[in-house]
Amino acid sequence: MAGTMPLRPTYVGFVRDTTDALLIFEACLSGTLSHVPRRPHDRERQDLIKSGNIFVYEEHASGIKRWTDSISWSPSRILGNYLLYRELEKPFPPGEKKRARGRNGKSTTQSGGISKARQRNTVPFPQGLEHGNEYPSVPSDDERHLVGSLVDSYDFKEQGLVKKTISITYQGVPHHLVSYYNVEDVKAGLLSGPSDDPRLRGVVPRTELMNGQNFRAPVEEAMGGSYMPSMVASIGYPTLQHQSQMHQSQMHQPQMHQPQMHQSQMHQSQMHQPQMHQPQAHQPQVHQPQVHPPQVHQPQAHQPQYQSQTLHPTHGYQQTYAGQPNAPSSTWW
């Protein structure tokens, strides 16, 4: 029955980081979004394998062991918790090992996942565009977040697709996400992420999805697998609002440190502050002469000294003696 129903992508947009993928996985587990029941048929691939389409399938229920889409892809490269593939201009010849191009345009042989160059070029690698690759040989940071290290190692198709995959295990069952996008579509802001989708605003990944996975990088540190729209603002592309990135930006914004002056430093600062000398106005001292109260001379009343008078015993008149003032010159008797 599932094979007769038309196949639709689980989601249309762009998964920037691990958190975006976990939102889609959680939405599928909770019934907000739907797993795809099968792989696309050959007649459906042209309409389904295109930029923006994201497919999530559960390995046991769908019976899908390997996702196929009839596109020639480069070998995978790790970017955060994702695997990246880029569309090739033409497939590798049958039976030939996949060989990466060296910087001088020569091919290299892969053995055990390690590439060894056949020839090394001593001439500095040109900064121009490689044949079949629209990206410069030294990519910018925003291109690294979209194509990883798949820059000029193979003969990539111009305006080709990038495939981005990630897997989780929930209750012992593997779930896989396969995303397709065109680099220019992401740069132009044509593909929004699940964090911007109002339908998924209330979706919160369950604890088993956040902590129970064997991710290469912790979820909060897996920004190496994301594309930061703010990185392309300087080259004129519109940016997207990403709620989780905005939240992390607020959390990691540098705080302006206000140095607090230590008490001893404050004391020293107070000690070393120049003191403004305020001249004290000289107050003239007014000499107050001490007023000596006039001493009032109190004349002492002269007490007349009375001389004892001796009356003459016979006559009764005053008797004087010679030598005393007013003494008579002679005696009368």
Curated annotation (Swiss-Prot):
- What is the top-level taxon of the source organism? Eukaryota
Listed A to Z, the keywords are: Activator, Nucleus, Transcription, Transcription regulation
Entry-linked Pfam families: Gti1_Pac2
An example GO CC term for this entry is: nucleus
- MF terms (GO), sorted A to Z: DNA binding
Location in the cell reads: Nucleus
- Amino-acid biosynthesis keyword on record: no
- Give positions of region: Disordered: 93-139, 241-307
Q: Does the keyword Transcription apply?
A: yes
- Induction trigger: Regulates its own expression in a negative feedback loop.
Q: Which family does it belong to?
A: Belongs to the MIT1/WOR1 family.
| Function field | Global transcriptional regulator that acts as an activator of secondary metabolism. Required for expression of a yet uncharacterized secondary metabolism gene cluster containing a non-canonical non-ribosomal peptide synthetase. Not required for conidiogenesis nor for pathogenicity, but is involved in vegetative growth.
This protein is called Global transcription regulator sge1
Source organism per UniProt: Gibberella fujikuroi (strain CBS 195.34 / IMI 58289 / NRRL A-6831)
Q: Please spell out the taxonomic lineage of the organism that makes this protein.
A: Eukaryota, Fungi, Dikarya, Ascomycota, Pezizomycotina
